[in-house]
Every structure is written in C-alpha cells, then in structure tokens.
C-alpha cells in the first residue's frame, strides 16, 4: 500500500504576513509487487507512482463551517486572513507533526519484509508503533491538519491517500480512547455499532461488568465495564455542547449520540419519570415547544413524519441560523417565543435540535402521566417519540 512517502513543509511564515501556508505535500506510491523485500536492502525505494500535490490549509473546516465562521465560502486567502495567530501557529505545528509521523512510518516500512497481501497489516502496525510512543506529545492542530488532508484526498477521489491518512487517524483515536474513562470508551464503541440489537447487547455486557468477547468476524473485543447512568449523562453532555452551537458540525454524530442517550436511559428501566434523567429544566425551550405544538395539532401520519424528518435533517424549523446576532433583517425569520409571541428571554432561540426535542417530548409525556391527563395526547406524543427515533436511526447509520 505504501512504498515511499516524501514530505515537504514550507518555511514557516509569520501570522502577520499571511503568506501561502503549505501543509506537507505527500508523494505517495503504492506499487508493492508480490515479491518480498530483503531486510538488508541498501538502496532506498525510489519509484514514485503517485504525486499528491501541495495544498493550502483553509483551517481544517468544511465549507459550511467556513461560511459560519467567516461569512464566506472557502476562499483560502480570506480564511488565512481571518485566522488568529494562535490558531495559525497550531495549524503549522500540527502539519509538521503529521509530516514527522508519516516519515517515521516510512522508516519502519522500508526495511519490512512483506508482500502484497500483508501490506495493509504492515501499514497499520507501523502506525501503531509510531503513534503509540508519540500520542502524549500530539499538538492541538494535529487532528485539524489530518482531517483537512483527508477532506482533500476525498475531493481528489484519491482513495489510496485517503486510506493511508485514515489509518493514521483511526490509530490516534484508538490510543486516545484507551486513555478515556470507561463510559467514554463505551460511547466510542457504540458510535461504531450500526445495528440496534448489537448496541443493546453491548450495553448489557457493559452493565454486567464488561470483559473480553469474540465478535461476529472472529476478532477479540475488550469491553470495559461502566455505569449506564454515566453513559447516558456523558452522551447528554456531548449533545448539549453540540446543540448549543449556532450550527451543527456533524449531524450524523449528533444522531448517534441521541440514540446512545435514549437507549442507555431505556435500559436503566426507570421510565419517563426517572429522576436520574432530569436535567433540572424549569422551562422548556421555545423552538421545540412550538414545533411540538404543530405536530400535536395534526393527525399522525406521513405528513407529520415528513415534518419530523425535515427538522431532524436540519431543514425548516431545524435549519442552522448562520446570520449574525445583530442582523436587524426580519425577512425569513420564524417568530420567537411560544406560539409566535415575543420571546420571554428577549433573545432569538436556537433552531429545533434533535436531543432537546426528544427531551421536550419526554418532559411533556411525564407531565401527562403524572397528572392523569387525556390518553389520546399521550399516545400521539409516544408516536412522535417513536418516529423521531426511527428518523435518527436512518440519519445516524
């Protein structure tokens, strides 16, 4: 997969000059033949099959994030002008460290005895060896630079370069995960488990104390023991952090975290009125209440389901608000406050968020059950809750 990678890094410009920033240009070649390499080979591997051109760093953000952050599409020069010196320096250091890691991997791979069948394993072993001893020294800009390199490889439709960089990223994440508390490790495992039944089985084994298990493909998997309440609370904390931002950077991850929180709470067996699930809200969020009122006013069916799907995907009432706070324009804005009245807080509420919406549905259901109110409304809300989870399942995996 990887024969040689030659990396160049431009001279480090000062943030004030904002000269062209070049992250490591990678010259990748992947032409291993079936013949083995001799351990004591004296010549360096020189054949270069694919040249991956240099590219400028735009900050490691997607086009949507760049628009949110700078109010412009991905214009490289403008983005660099907007970067503050600390962020600019972090990018430089991160890029240099990616270069260093890949160079050290080459050193290990050059003298390895391998054939075409074992090259993928060899790359993974080299990544484990190099990153394992350097993970504690990783710069804050390392993952930002690596993510941007992967984005560009994907845009260039360069699967080999993308695959190599993803091996490095997965290895780094794996090492970082091992340093996390057990309930955080479990969330990482659940995010990579697409089948609902498998997630439930994983949660059961985690609640039982964890241990070593054999997966369907025969590989050994170590599952840590953790408290279900800790898992639900951690997922909820991550959700709150993501949902209070003006724009959601990754809706797929957001949907996975919502499912993890709801499934962990459901497995605790305390029901809707379980005090462990109480966030301590004194009032419910305006946007979610307005949207829920619309859904309850309509008969359950395809129309309501489509409304839920649109909002969960970030459309209609769930669309991210990228306008500035001081924008006086009222065109296209939805009314603030409950039922179109003025906002109680005087601030424009956030759009409808998946995690907060399900939290709102649960709170309203809890009030209905504790007050012995009409059963028809409760059934309607249960249906909304169920359909929302189905939609999030489709988005998440």
UniProtKB/Swiss-Prot annotation:
Instruction: Provide the free-text tissue specificity comment from this protein's UniProt record.
Output: Highly expressed in young leaves, shoots and flowers. Expressed at low levels in stems and siliques.
Q: Tell me one GO biological process term.
A: chloroplast organization
> Where is the protein situated, by its record's location annotation?
Plastid, Chloroplast stroma, Chloroplast nucleoid
Q: What induces it?
A: Induced by light.
Transit peptide keyword on record:
yes
Q: One GO CC annotation, please?
A: chloroplast nucleoid
Please summarize what the entry says happens upon disruption of the gene: Seedling lethality due to deficiency in chloroplast development.
Transit peptide range per the UniProt entry: 1-52
Q: Which residues form a coiled coil?
A: none
> Could you tell me which InterPro entries the record lists for this protein?
PRDA1 (IPR038961)
Name the major location. Answer: plastid
Region: Disordered; residue ranges are 315-351
Q: What keywords is this UniProt entry annotated with?
A: Chloroplast, Plastid, Transit peptide
Biased amino acid composition, Basic and acidic residues: 315-334
Complex and partners: Interacts with FSD2 and MRL7.
What function is annotated for this protein? Plays an essential role in early steps of chloroplast development. May be involved in the redox control of plastid gene expression by maintening the redox state around chloroplast nucleoids. May positively regulate plastid-encoded RNA polymerase (PEP) activity, through binding to FSD2.
Q: What is this protein called?
A: Protein PEP-RELATED DEVELOPMENT ARRESTED 1, chloroplastic
The lineage is: Eukaryota, Viridiplantae, Streptophyta, Embryophyta, Tracheophyta
């Amino acid at each position: 997969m990887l024969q040689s990678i030659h990396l160049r890094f431009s001279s480090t410009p000062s943030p004030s000059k904002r000269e062209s920033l070049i992250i490591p240009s990678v010259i990748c070649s992947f032409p291993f033949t079936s013949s083995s390499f001799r351990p004591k080979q004296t010549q360096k591997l020189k054949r270069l099959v694919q040249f991956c051109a240099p590219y400028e760093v735009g900050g490691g953000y997607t086009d949507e994030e760049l628009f949110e952050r700078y109010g412009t599409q991905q214009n490289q020069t403008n983005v660099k002008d907007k970067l503050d010196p600390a962020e600019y320096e972090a990018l430089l250091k991160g890029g240099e460290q990616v270069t260093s890691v890949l160079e050290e991997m080459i050193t290990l791979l050059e003298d390895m005895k391998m054939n075409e069948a074992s090259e993928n394993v060899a790359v993974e072993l080299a990544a484990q060896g190099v990153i394992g001893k350097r993970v504690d020294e990783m710069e804050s800009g390392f993952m930002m630079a690596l993510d941007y390199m992967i984005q560009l490889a994907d845009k260039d439709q360069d699967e080999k370069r993308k695959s190599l960089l993803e091996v490095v990223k997965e290895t780094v994440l794996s090492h970082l995960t091992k340093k996390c508390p057990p309930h955080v490790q479990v969330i990482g495992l659940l995010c990579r488990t697409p089948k609902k039944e498998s997630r439930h089985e994983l949660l059961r084994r985690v609640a039982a104390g964890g241990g070593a298990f054999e997966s369907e493909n025969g590989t050994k998997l170590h599952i840590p023991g953790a408290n279900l309440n800790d898992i639900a609370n951690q997922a909820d904390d991550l959700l709150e952090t993501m949902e209070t931002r003006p724009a959601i950077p990754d809706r797929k991850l957001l949907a996975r975290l919502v499912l993890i929180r709801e499934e962990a709470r459901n497995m605790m067996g305390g029901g809707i009125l379980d005090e462990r699930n109480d966030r301590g809200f004194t009032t419910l969020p305006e946007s979610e209440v307005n949207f829920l009122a619309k859904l309850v006013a309509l008969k359950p069916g395809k129309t309501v389901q489509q409304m839920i799907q649109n909002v969960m995907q970030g459309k209609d009432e769930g669309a991210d608000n990228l306008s500035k706070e001081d924008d006086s324009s009222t065109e296209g804005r939805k009314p603030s406050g409950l039922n179109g009245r003025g906002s109680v807080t005087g601030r424009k509420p956030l759009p409808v968020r998946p995690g907060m919406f399900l939290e709102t549905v649960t709170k309203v259901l809890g009030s209905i059950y504790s007050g012995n109110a009409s059963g028809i409304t409760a059934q309607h809300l249960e249906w909304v809750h169920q359909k929302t989870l189905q939609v999030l399942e489709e988005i998440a995996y």
